[in-house]
């Protein structure tokens, strides 16, 4: 596993705000896997448009400028764009290129003198035969290698290499990496081929490969990440095939970039119901966005059919997407703010998620002790801190207390509330950053193996971790997915998908008796702790206790 400093470096880099600008709609290669080929029309973007984007990106807070294409180096104003990026004080000016133009040293010198700081070369074969066949130009490999050598010998730019993994090169990944390591390259980005552009239209049979059959080749390449002198990144690779190298799984934050690249189509889908042009079963099953798009379809359908039983919000909303939901869910700092939110939401029942429950009172309604907020009956309150646990238990009442298990709450329960009080249920939080997982997560089998919670509900905790079949998480529509116009917004949706729905399982989970109903765990749980804790339950005895992870 990578050390903590390396992981934090990767996480900071993934979350850096970038201004990715396409300079051209043309290329001097014709890659068989080009995902942008449908947008190529043989033109360059106007210099004024590009310069405006460079300036605007900096105003919007971007710190890294990435000049891309098509092929960016063939734009006649390429050097000007580099210079403008430096004048705008971007922390880093980077380009992604096929590198052929950098085989001409005078051109490279002009670019570096203008302020180009990082060059990402796209190389796809260990030799001219494979590379040139993939990029469609004889001699391209020799030119690109010369460009890499020129850049390394100059010493000024950071040099790294992108490799699009496909059927023609997957068996040669380590050979390619060895060759470029030998001449001084220290950073590689391994990109899984995706079914867009020519990759789908022309390369479906020749470029896509079976993961099971080629897993050993992928694992061998990932093993280079163990070397302290190298940086290895992986993009769009199905996470289950990265077991043993889970810290290399693409940061889920980068899904926002994937969505941004198809924003216009997503907007058409949400505004007018226009199906995505890429919608095709053969394509979708090979696409890294398949789960995100599938959940989006279900979200749209749920809104249309009013099938979400719970509507959640973290601020008062002007208009609910529909007014017949059963339950409201208010996320707030305190009960006063929660009441203001709840008053704008439909539903007779209420879930509270507050940092501080001071002021929450119990009323006697029809002879039953009940908490009422904004006229709604509280059926559940989430507790994320020891203080919240104590506040809620002291109140009495008949609502459920859903404790989010963290290092702090687990220790508090062991010391002050063991065995588990009758109203407690247990769940776990998802985190945006791996470093937050490290700071908060507990080893669940150890907790449930030592804490007396036999009768307590587990929600969203796999049976192998909690020792019994969990209750599924409630069906929730989160109002944070809505734009200012009150309609579903693709970036709001993507953010909530990453936080709430981006779950994964180990390949061995297929053998578990709970596989069909189990959601798995959040992607950042796996990026933090690996797939090792996920061990299939092979007997239907739910009370056998949590399954210990392999050593």
Predicted regions and their residues:
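N-terminal [4Fe-4S]-dependent radical SAM core
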Residues: 1-21, 255-274, 290, 310-336, ...
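Canonical Radical SAM [4Fe-4S] cluster-binding loop centered on the CxxxCxxC motif
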Residues: 11-49, 290-293, 297
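Short acidic/His/Gly/Ser-rich catalytic and metal-binding motifs that mark active-site loops
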Residues: 30-33, 130, 196-201
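Short glycine-enriched, charge-decorated loop/helix-capping segments at active-site entrances
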Residues: 36-44, 133-139, 204-209
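Soluble or luminal CAZymes and related metallo-dependent hydrolases
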Residues: 45-49, 139-143, 168, 172, ...
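Radical SAM/AdoMet-radical enzyme domain recognition
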Residues: 51-66, 75-192, 339-416, 423-425
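Short Fe-S-cluster ligation motifs
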Residues: 56-74, 308-328, 534-551
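Accessory C-terminal segments flanking Radical SAM cores
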Residues: 196-311, 417-547, 551
């Amino acid at each position: 596993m990578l050390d903590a400093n390396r992981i934090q470096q990767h996480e900071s880099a993934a979350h850096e705000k970038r201004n990715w600008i396409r300079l051209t709609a043309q290329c001097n290669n014709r890659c068989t896997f080009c995902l942008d080929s449908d947008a190529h029309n043989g033109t360059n973007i106007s210099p004024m448009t590009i310069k405006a984007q460079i300036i605007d990106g900096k105003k919007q807070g971007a710190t890294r400028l990435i000049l891309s294409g098509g092929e960016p180096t063939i734009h006649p104003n390429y050097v000007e764009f580099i210079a403008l990026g430096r004048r705008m004080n971007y922390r880093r000016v980077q380009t992604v290129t096929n590198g052929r133009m950098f085989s001409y040293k005078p051109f490279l010198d002009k670019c570096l003198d203008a302020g180009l700081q990082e060059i990402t070369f796209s190389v796809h074969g260990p030799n001219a035969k494979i590379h040139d066949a993939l990029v469609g130009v004889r001699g391209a490999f020799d030119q690109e290698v010369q460009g890499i050598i020129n850049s390394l010998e100059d010493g000024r730019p950071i040099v790294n290499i992108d490799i699009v993994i496909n059927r023609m090169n997957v068996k040669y990944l380590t050979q390619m990496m060895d060759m470029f390591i030998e001449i001084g390259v220290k950073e590689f980005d391994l990109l899984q081929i995706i079914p867009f552009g020519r990759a789908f239209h022309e390369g479906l049979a020749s470029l896509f490969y079976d993961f099971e059959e080629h897993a050993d080749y992928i694992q061998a390449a990932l093993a280079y990440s163990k070397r302290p002198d190298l940086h290895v990144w992986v993009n769009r690779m199905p996470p289950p095939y990265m077991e043993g190298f889970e810290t290399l799984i693409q940061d889920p934050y980068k899904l926002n970039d994937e969505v941004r690249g198809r924003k216009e189509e997503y907007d058409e889908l949400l505004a007018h119901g226009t199906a995505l042009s890429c919608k095709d079963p053969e394509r979708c099953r090979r696409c890294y966005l398949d789960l995100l798009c599938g959940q989006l379809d279900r979200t749209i359908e749920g809104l249309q059919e009013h099938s979400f039983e719970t509507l959640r919000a973290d601020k008062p909303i002007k208009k609910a997407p529909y007014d017949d939901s059963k339950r409201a869910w208010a996320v707030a700092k305190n009960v006063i703010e929660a009441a203001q939110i709840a008053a704008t939401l439909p539903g007779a029942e209420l879930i509270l998620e507050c940092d501080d429950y001071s002021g929450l009172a119990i009323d006697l309604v029809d002879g039953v002790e009940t908490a009422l907020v904004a006229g709604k009956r509280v059926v559940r309150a989430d507790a994320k801190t020891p203080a919240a646990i104590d506040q809620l238990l002291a109140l009495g009442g008949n609502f459920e207390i859903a404790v989010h298990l963290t290092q702090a709450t687990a220790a508090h329960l062991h010391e002050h509330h063991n065995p588990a009080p009758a109203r407690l249920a247990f769940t776990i939080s998802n985190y945006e950053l791996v470093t937050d997982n490290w700071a908060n997560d507990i080893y669940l089998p150890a907790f449930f193996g030592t804490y007396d919670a036999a009768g307590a509900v587990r929600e969203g905790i796999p049976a192998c971790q909690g020792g019994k079949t969990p209750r599924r998480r409630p069906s929730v529509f989160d109002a944070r997915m809505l734009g200012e116009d009150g309609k579903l917004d693709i970036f709001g949706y993507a953010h909530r998908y990453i936080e709430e729905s981006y779950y994964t399982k180990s390949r061995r989970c297929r053998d578990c008796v709970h596989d069909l109903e189990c959601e798995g765990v959040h992607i950042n749980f796996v990026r933090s702790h690996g797939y090792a804790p996920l061990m299939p339950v092979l007997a239907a005895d739910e009370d056998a206790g949590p399954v210990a992870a392999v050593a």
